Amino acid sequence: MGFTSLHLAKRTGRLAALALLAASLTGCQVISGSPQYTLARVIDATPDVPAPGGLDVYQNSTVSLYNIGFGTASSYIPVTPGSLSYSIDIAGTRQQLANVGGTFALGAQYTVLIGNVTANLRMTVLKDQSIPAPTGQVAFRFLDQSTRTGLVDIYLLPLGSTLTAASPILSGIGFDNAPSYIDVPSGTYSIVVVPTGTVPGSGTSPLYSGSQIDYASGAARTIVLIDQPLVTTPSLKVIPADDYDSPVATN
C-alpha cells in the first residue's frame, strides 16, 4: 500500500525501451524483522532526471543519500519510527522535484520509490515484507515502473521447463500497478517478461529472459520494471532486491 505522493516536476522527455530492476542490497541483506528497528530504502526508477542527472534524497529536510542515479537502490537504512517525510532534489541543488510523507511503524521495512518521467515525477512509500514467506514458499512482488512499454505478462520458469509449457504468474501488468506479494514454491526459477497476450512459441522475443536463480524457502523479493535509456529495442535486466531472508537460509 502506498502513501500519497506529490507531483512537482515540470520537465518533459522520455527514454526508450525497458529494463527490469530489482535492486541488490548491501549491508542489511538478512532482515529478520527485529522490532527495535524501522528500516527504509530508496529505489530510483525515473529515467530522465534533469542534468547533471543525479538526485539527492532528504529525510525530514536532512540529506539521506547523495547523487543517486537511475536504477539505483540503496541498502536498508535504520530510521526513527513515526511520521517521516522524504523529498528529492536535483543533485547539488535545492531544486525540489517531489516529496512524500507517511507513518513508518516500529519494526517494519519500507521502500521509498521514485518513479515516472520527470514531467509527472512522483514518490511512493511501500511497506515491504519483513516476515518469512510460508515454509517451502518464496514471496515475489513485481512493481511496474516502465513508462514506454504496454502491458506485460510475467513468467517464473522452473529449472528445465520452457515457456511453451508455462502459464504466467501475472498477466496484464501495467505502469504503476498496485503491487502485492505472491507466494510460490521455493526453488530455481528464471524470470521471463513478454508483451501481454504473447503466445509462447509464436516467434515474439521476450522483453526479458533471465538466468536461473535459486530462491530459498521463506525469502521475499521485489522486482521493479523500469525504462532503460539509449536502447532502440526493448530489453530488460533483473537485479534481485532482498526484502527478507531467513537467518538460516542461503541462496
Residue ranges and their predicted role:
Residues G2-A16:
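Bacterial N-terminal signal peptides that target proteins for export
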Residues A23-G27:
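C-terminal motif of bacterial Sec signal peptides marking the signal peptidase cleavage site
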Residues A17-A22:
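Hydrophobic helical h-region of N-terminal Sec-dependent signal peptides
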Residues C28-N251:
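Intrinsically disordered, low-complexity polar regions and short flexible loop motifs
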